A protein has these predicted regions:
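Glycine-rich phosphate/pyrophosphate-binding beta-alpha loops
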Residues: 1-4, 50, 87-91
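A short core secondary-structure module
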Residues: 1-41
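Conserved hydrophobic/aromatic beta-strand scaffold that supports enzyme active sites
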Residues: 9-13, 29-31, 55-62, 70
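A short beta-sheet element
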Residues: 13, 44, 85-88
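Cytochrome P450 core scaffold surrounding the K-helix E-X-X-R motif
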Residues: 21, 68-74
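Flexible, small-/acidic-enriched active-site or ligand-binding loops
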Residues: 35-66
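Short clusters of hydrophobic/aromatic residues that line enzyme substrate/ligand-binding pockets
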Residues: 39-41, 45, 50, 70-71, ...
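Alpha-helical interface subdomain recognition
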Residues: 57-63, 72-76, 82-169
């Protein structure tokens, strides 16, 4: 779980009504305090990237919380989570697009400065072909991201459209 080592309050999505169908119904979001009996932090997990925030194991053994620790209406947790999904996916797309742009900019600097056979790598025709292709893909990505952001700001971005933004990037 992200920031598990530092969290004072943990949001747990769990099934609180096992009789209701379909399965996504009956899921609630429960707040669990880090000092609650039965809760224990585990180890930090090794990850590839995104090291600014830890990712930790968490253990819950017979943890009991009062009904007042239910965030929102009982059984509506999945609906709450899904209502935020487009924004979450859009955030991932923004991060990917900006990282791609930075990588492209760094590559352009490198091929301008790096010399091979007495001339900059930028002067080779194939390098220019590849950079032109990458720049075009970046431009399409920015245009798509602008479109998705505009829809999000109007509260019109659907989960499917947000998935497309994430997929592209």
């Amino acid at each position: 779980i992200t920031n598990g080592q530092n969290a004072d309050l943990i949001l747990v999505c769990c099934k609180t009504d096992t009789d209701v169908q379909p399965a996504w119904k009956g899921v609630s979001i429960i707040l669990v305090e880090a000092d609650r009996e039965g809760y224990k932090r585990g180890r930090n997990l090794d990850k590839v990237g995104l090291d600014a925030a830890d990712t930790s194991e968490m253990f819950f053994e017979d943890v009991r919380v009062p009904i007042t620790n239910c965030l929102g209406a009982e059984g509506q947790g999945f609906i709450y989570l899904m209502s935020e999904l487009p924004q979450e996916r859009l955030g991932i797309a923004i991060g990917a697009q900006t990282a791609a742009q930075r990588a492209f900019d760094m590559t352009c600097t490198f091929v301008r400065d790096r010399k091979v056979f007495g001339k900059p790598v930028m002067d080779f025709q194939n390098t220019r072909f590849v950079l032109a292709d990458l720049k075009t893909k970046l431009q399409v990505g920015w245009a798509h991201l602008d479109w998705a952001l505009a829809r999000h700001m109007k509260k019109e971005l659907t989960p499917v459209e947000a998935s497309g933004a994430k997929l592209w990037h």
